[in-house]
């Protein structure tokens, strides 16, 4: 009968970094489940292959780091050396003898001659020993004797520096003092002279090794994408948080629908756009809308700035583009969002002067990746820019960023919706009217409205109010539009009178021009850097077209302040510089761009940028598309428009001289005249009166010589 063979136990292999699994886990690994479902955060957006095994797979943290059967090796640390040195110094301090009195060599000789020395140890540089404290009252200083007797009674230790004294030994022998030779104790200085340089060298060496190792690691990671990944609902933004841009939300809802149900479009043979370009002015909500799309679709969201691609090393930008798209393929369906695309996708230079080889190579790699990208993989590329005119045409062609979503500044209804979103966490007073506030903020983008609400809340908190009132919103609007109010400056009374008539001239002309915007406030309180006063006009509705008659009325309002100064004082000031500049620009646009000149006809005469410098970032030299004689005709037409406006304004102010004087007097008294006060003033019967004498003690800002700036409700 054959003996059963005895099985030898096999040597247990050392398996580092493996999972400790039971039989069920082993079966799961055979089936291909190598990833713990609970660690899916490392691979966001990818569901586990077998959800039923989610609770059965476990990692042994010790096994992942190191085999527990192996002894851990102790690593040498610089702290060991430092602790040892400190311990040695502590031992020396603790076990040293009692207090040692340091005395001059002359006192040592006095004690020797008086026979008070007990024993002496003579070293190379110092002499130490003990002496008797009895009968030394007249030998040492009184303060020193008191200190010695406080320390100890009887014999006391001393120390003194050795002086070249050849008769010292003879004197010690004559005094019958026991003395010995003693070498100096240099062990501490010797240790420090060896250990300290070694410690410094070791520290520098360790620091350099770590820096080199870190640099090597960073060099390996330099080509990796720097995109921030937000998983599913981590963006924290949905379409409910976006208001005032309903058209853009409707346009992007198709993207959300594709990411949620791609088969719906693929079944009919449709393909979702590969790239979506969000175009709009700063603050219109481009980045917010992209996050809302990712939050609605519930997919990973890769966020990266256009400037993050380019580094100081050549080729890094292209490598990061490749790595970004490679990561996106593994996380599909997902969204890649590139903010400030113009930093990366600027038009490639036509010549070698303005070329940027590294940026252009990065752009080329982006074009290649987008061109070879399969739109059915579920990866949507979104980008945002506020300068679409400088983007490379190859980037905007169909097949890349083939869908452009324009985000315009919100209209009246949109501004009201945006305000409702931003005031959700703000305690509002009952009289706050968001519709009225939206009407007073034409041209405000979403970021501007958010800033307005925040400023109003801060002003209310500064005044210790329990809720934000409408007055806080009015003050916040004035701060944003006109700048910080400066009441503490003392202004020359004559200059204050000039500013009052200047602003009154604007207001009177605006009230007598039916097509001009309505005056909402007139103030002679300085604001900001250069505004010594302002006349605020608020349009009653959003306007997208302006007629020639409306532009002429606006010209009249701009010249109202200058003509009022000339009419009242017979002289003009520098305060109208900004008015004249804006009036000249408006008149030139009417002639060169809008075709509103009878002499020049319907042709446009804009200065065109030189295409040689397009997209190079260099200063673009404008070239005229018309002759010198045409330029002279344009200048003549501009002067003609301004002269005609000046005559109309002068006629209006001369006919309303009484109201002009009265409104200026009212401004000198109240400093700020709102719409309610202005209506009462215009409806009241005004008696003619001479120009008012300004009050000298009214606090205002000093004359700066800078032009005043009127807010025209922009």
Swiss-Prot record:
Side Cytoplasmic, residues: 1-75, 210-714
Residues engaged in binding Zn(2+): 502, 506, 579
Cellular compartment(s): Cell inner membrane
Residue ranges of the region described as Disordered: 688-714
Bias type Polar residues, positions: 699-714
HAMAP family found in the cross-reference section: FtsH
Subunit field text: Homohexamer.
Protein name: ATP-dependent zinc metalloprotease FtsH
